Amino acid sequence: MTGRRKGGEAAVEACVGGPAEALEEAPPEVADLAAACVRAVHRALGVELDYDPDSIPLLDHYLTLLPNRPREPTREPVRGLVAAMTGAYFGEVVRRLFPARWTIEPGGEAVDWRLEFRYCFLAFSPVAVAWEVLLRCDAPDGAAAYFLEEPTRGQVAERLDRLPRVPIDDYYTFAQRLETLVLTAGWLAERVRQSGRSPRPIEPERYAEFFRRLRTPG
């Protein structure tokens, strides 16, 4: 166990859930891919990623250096590994900012792995985000979205729509996705504070039911 890094964003206290918690170990498959990302970036840039949010621009820079980044089908296995590595690292950075857990369903692919916040209902697939950043286009079926319950999802979407438009070159970056995530978590925390309630842990079953319904046609 290692100590959780304090994020420094006062607005997200409700999503953090109180005092700093011990950071649980990541699932082995996530930890291995994130470590592989650290090694790959070190080889390319000579810099050691440290799982700090300030390292995310370095991750974006690393992707710009990859040869043949566009969409040649023959590079699918290579792109898949890069997406899995960088997504795992991105998820681990987020997990050091906010209490969250990885959910890995048996037989699922890396793009299906979810990071689920513990004290506010917010979940996403870091590897799906990585695919969008890597290919610079939206993932099918909204796989890289930040998943929220209704009516919160619509309310957050309205607030995001009121923000200044982001240039396309910035939109498909990990740095921009992290900024949007922090804003979203801050708004969720604001709602909890205004309600006067203390943050309560969200059970895994609530997320599981949400995604079951999402996958059910009709």
Positions of PLM-derived features:
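Short amphipathic alpha-helical segments that mediate assembly, nucleic-acid/protein binding
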Residues: G8-E9, R153-V156, P204-Y207
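A sequence-level detector of short, solvent-exposed, charge-rich linear segments
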Residues: I56, V78, V82, D112-W113, ...
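Extended, Lys/Arg-enriched charged tracts that mediate electrostatic binding to polyanionic substrates
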Residues: G80-A100, V192-L214
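Aromatic- and glycine-enriched beta-alpha-beta binding-site module
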Residues: L81-V129
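N-terminal low-complexity, intrinsically disordered segments
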Residues: T2-A83
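Generic structural signal for hydrophobic core residues of well-folded globular domains
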Residues: L66, L97-F98, V133-C137
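A recognition module on extended beta-rich or small alphabeta surfaces enriched in W/G with H and D/E
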Residues: R114-R200
